[in-house]
C-alpha cells in the first residue's frame, strides 16, 4: 500500500462538520429557534400564524405550540424544542422564556468561543452560575398558602395575560383557581388530568363556564328517556348491555316456529334481567363504556333511566372521581353502594350539539371547563391559555413559592451573579458574567415587545435593584415604568423560573459539548437519515 494513499472511513454521501464549524452551526440553529419565539414573549407579545401543507391554520403565541407545529429538521434545533416540551410537561408555562434564555446563552457562549475560551470552561462557568441562580431564586421567593385564592388568582391572570383571553381573564382566572383547588388531593398534589377542558364554538369567551362535575360530549341513547334527572343515582358500567355472542362458529337449526319465538323471548328476557338489575340497584342514570342494545334502550326508557353509551374511558374515570361511583365490569355485580350521586344530570344543546351535564356533585374530585369562543382559532388559543394557567396554579399549590414577574427575578439574578462572579477564579468568571448578561434577555425582550426603549428600561431596572431590597421591581409593560410587581399582582411560581433556567442551561451545555456532526444525505429512492441542509444555516437553512 502506498504511504500517501488516503484511508476512506466514511462513504461519500456523508456530510461532516468538525470542531469550530460544528459548534458554530449548532449555536446558530439554537439561536434561530430562540429568535423565532422571542417576539411572542410577555403580555404585549405578538402571535404567529402557522400554516401546514393542507392549509390548516394555527394562530398562537404559545411557545411550545409554535415549536411543535414548525417543521424543523436541524438536530440542534430539535434539542431546543425539547426544552420547550420539557417545560410544558413539568410546569405548564414558561416555555417561551426557557427557549429565549437558551438562545441567548448560546449567543453569549459564541462570543466567549470567539475569544478563545474553551467550551469546557464555558460549560463549567454556566454550571456554577445556574447553581448560584437557583440559590438566589429560593432566597427571593415568597411563601404562599395553598388556600390563598387571591394570590392564586393573580398567578392565573399573569399566565393568561396576552394569550388571546385578555377580556375575560378575571373570570377565567377565578374559574381556574376553583377548578384546581377542587382536585387537590390529601397530600397537596394536583392531578391536572382531572380537569377536563371541553371546547364549543358559537359564543363569546365570556360565556365560558366551570362545571362542578363532568361534561360528556354525548347524547342519551333514546329520545324516550328523560332529559333531566334530579338527585341522580349514577351507575358506571364497563360492560355491554347486549346479548353476548358466542366466539365459536356454531349454528342453531330451528325446525319448529315456536322454538324461534322461545329463542327470541330468551334474548329479550336476558336484556330485561340486565335492566332490572340496574333498576334494583336504585340507579336512575347510566353511563356505559360499551354498547346498549336497542331493546335494552326501550326497557331503560320505560323505567325512566337516562342512559349514555360508548363513553370514553377517561370520562368514566372522571365521572367516578366526580360522583363517587365505582366502575363495574360485570352487570351482575352492580349494587347500591357502587352508585354515585349528582344534583342534576341533564342533556342540553350547546352550539346545536347535545351534551350531558353531570352537575352539583357534593365533593367533586373532577371538574370540567367548557371553553366558548366565536371561532375555532379563538377557542384553541383560549384553551391553551387555560391549560398553561392550570399548570402554574397547580405548581403554586404544590410548592407554595412564588417570585415576582415582569423581569424582576431575572434582573435580580443578573445583579447577584455579577457580584458572585467577582469571587470566581480563572476564565470561568467570564462565563458566569455571560450567564448574568444572558438572563437580562427576558426584561429586554419584554420592553422591545411593548414598543419601549429596551436599553433605557434595563438601565432603570438595574439602578432600582442596585439600591437594595428592591428584588420585586420589574417592568410594567402597560405603563412603561419600573414598579413593584408583587403589588401589581404580577407573580409567577418559583418552579416555572427554576425549571426554565435549568432546562435552558442543560440544553446549551449539551450543544457546546458537540464538536463533530456526521449526517448521511438522503439516499435517492429510499429513506435515509436526512438532517436537513446543515451547512446552509445562513438563513433558516434546512430547519423549516
Swiss-Prot record:
The family database entries (PROSITE patterns) matched by this protein are listed as:
TCP1_1, TCP1_2, TCP1_3
Q: Which UniProt keywords apply?
A: ATP-binding, Chaperone, Nucleotide-binding
- SUPFAM superfamilies, per database record: GroEL apical domain-like, GroEL equatorial domain-like, GroEL-intermediate domain like
- Please give the InterPro entries that the UniProt record associates with this protein: Chaperone_TCP-1, Chaperonin_TCP-1_CS, Cpn60/GroEL/TCP-1, GroEL-like_apical_dom_sf, GROEL-like_equatorial_sf, TCP-1-like_intermed_sf, TCP-1_chaperonin, thermosome_alpha
PANTHER family membership:
CHAPERONIN
Which protein family is it in?
Belongs to the TCP-1 chaperonin family.
The task this protein performs is described as:
Molecular chaperone; binds unfolded polypeptides in vitro, and has a weak ATPase activity.
Q: What is this protein called?
A: Thermosome subunit
Phylogenetic lineage: Archaea, Methanobacteriati, Methanobacteriota, Methanomada group, Methanococci
Question: Which gene codes for it?
Answer: ths
